[in-house]
Amino acid sequence: MPDHLHHSTPALTSRAYEGVGDLSKMLDLLMEARSQTNDWHCAHVGELLWNYLVLSSHLPEREHIRLWHDRDGKLAGYALLREGPSVDWEVLPRYEGAGIEEGALAWVEGRLAELRARDPEKWKKKLGTGARADDAQRIAFLDEHGFHPGKYAEVNMIRSLEGPIPAATVPAGYVLRAVEAKDVHSRAEAERVVWFPCSDGDISDENYARLMTLPGYVRELDLAAVTPDGIVASNLNAWPDPVNRIGDFGPVGTRAEHRRKGLQRALLLEGMRRLKEHGMERVCVSTGVENLAAQALYLSVGFQIVNRWQEWVQGE
């Protein structure tokens, strides 16, 4: 048994999410957990921030985020019930197997019963979650609690930022720069155009403006290729984990009429350069196993496939 699982059962309490101060502690939890495990044991802070934005843009946060604290008041774990429905939970390594996972699932099932009674059409689908291929403990937990592998999967990719990074070649007619306040409408619109009707694409201008105020957001790492008339043609959000010196890319997108021009390649290279300036030593990105075009692009700029995330669905 790993050292971090040798513990007496702690006194854990749970409560609803109360505000951005809790979000900051959730980010701290992810960075601490990664420092004690590996690059794939838990979500990256960038994944949490984007998932939080989408959740809080559509759902009441207090009803869809649950926190667990130890006897000293330290955040030990959290769970998010998102649209889909899907659940994400993260637990500090020393508290894995201490009951938070069961508590999170029980909380989600209780909330889903309430939501389905209130709006059966919106919440009718089976509960989903996910696990990485090398996370035997989570896979065993899901199997024991009635989940089975679903249809969707992603490849997880990583690239070292050591050594020189090729210069970004920006196609004629575009400017590559950080997103500014004046770009909020076009940046949010780009998200809607590329990803809607997925919930990730249902982002208003006001929602995106709020993202820019959250802890963990770094404006210099929110990149876009912009046309002369101010249209965000392509975008890339880069996120730093300053504790573990690993960056993350996502979301990554380009409007259809601006594709096949090299914009995403330029943004990826510039994102790497800026992450390196912010002290990152490596960067990760994920994409669907069937999205061969995205995989080819990431491989072409030095990423390697090192892991796989698999959807798991509850019930038969």
Model feature map: region roles:
Residues R138, L142, Y298, F303:
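Conserved active-site tyrosine of GNAT-family acetyltransferases
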Residues G77, K151-A153, A233-S234, N307:
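A structural microfeature
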Residues G97-E114, T254, R260-E277, R282, ...:
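Conserved acetyl-CoA-binding loop-helix of GNAT-fold acetyltransferases
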Residues L127-T129, F249, V283-T287:
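Conserved hydrophobic beta-strand within the GNAT/NAT acetyltransferase core sheet
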Residues R15-L23, M31-R118, A131, P228, ...:
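Conserved donor-binding loop and adjoining core beta-sheet/short helix segment
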Residues M1-H7, A79-A172, E311-Q314:
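Acyl-donor-binding surface of acyltransferase catalytic domains
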Residues M1-N51, A168-D202, I231:
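Short amphipathic alpha-helix that is part of the acyltransferase structural core
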Residues G163-G247:
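Flexible, substrate/cofactor-facing loop regions flanked by secondary structure
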